[in-house]
A protein has these predicted regions:
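Cyclic nucleotide signaling catalytic output domains
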Residues: 151, 158-188, 193-223
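Hydrophobic framework residues that shape the active-site pocket
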Residues: 76, 95, 119, 159
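Catalytic core regions of nucleotide second-messenger enzymes
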Residues: 107, 112-113, 141-157
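Active-site-flanking beta-strand signature of metal-NTP-handling nucleotidyl enzymes
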Residues: 67-73, 111
Length: 226
């Protein structure tokens, strides 16, 4: 009986140790899973939501009105070609930080990077404020971006803005913003265009021409002399 009494504490200790190990393992698995999910929805360069993260946000907003501003940096390719990809990355990081700061106090607002230099702002709002949202983008980018090495670069952006109603299909909303964006770029860039069905639907046929002009026309990002 005495031997049994001595073994009980040891068995209990082993059981407790096993339980602690199991709990720690579960917690570690949860941390890894959370990090994996975060990596799936976050753009690694800018820290913004990525396309998957944006899709999740728009799915949550399906029953609410919201505004979208689709942003494309004018002449961004020239930044990479002239100053290198490190400079291009620095521009993207700074632009992302400024746009995030501009919406920092807006409840539920999200800034996401779709890829390349294309960024989208989503702002839940009971009243249509797409134009105001687009103007905020222009204001946020007014000051020059300082590149590695100290060179200052003035970055301009074209913005396509659209106000979505509750129940609107998110893919159609983004398409509308895209059409407005290309109208802004076709008009010279550096400006905001709000979606207008009468004006933007014909752009579908003109879009290849607009793309050709973007590739062959003058650069729209202005900075110091190369």
């Amino acid at each position: 009986m005495k031997a049994m009494k001595m073994l009980l504490p040891a068995a209990a200790a082993l059981s407790l140790a096993g339980h602690v190990w199991a709990v720690r393992t579960v917690r570690a698995d949860r941390v890894r899973l959370a990090e994996a999910r975060r990596q799936v929805t976050i753009d690694p360069l800018t820290g913004l939501a990525n396309r998957s993260g944006l899709s999740a946000v728009l799915a949550d907003l399906v029953d609410e009105p919201y505004d979208v501003a689709l942003v494309d940096l004018d002449g961004f390719k020239q930044v990479n070609d002239t100053f290198g990809h490190d400079a291009g990355d620095a521009v993207l990081v700074e632009v992302a930080a400024r746009l995030s700061a501009a919406l920092d106090e807006v409840d539920g607002a999200v800034v996401a990077r779709l890829g390349g230099d294309e960024i989208v702002l989503v702002c839940p709002s009971p009243a249509p404020i797409a134009g105001i949202l687009g103007a905020e983008v222009v204001r946020a980018l007014a000051a020059p971006v300082v590149l590695p090495g100290g060179r200052e670069l003035l970055v301009r952006a074209s913005v396509g803005a659209v106000s979505a109603m509750a129940g609107d299909d998110s893919s159609r909303v983004l398409r509308a913003a895209d059409l407005a964006l290309y109208r802004a770029k076709a008009a010279g860039g550096g400006q905001v265009a709000e979606y207008d069905r009468a004006e933007d639907l014909p752009v579908i046929e003109q879009r290849p021409v607009v793309r050709l002009r973007e590739m062959t026309g003058p650069a729209r990002v202005l900075g110091g002399a190369a």
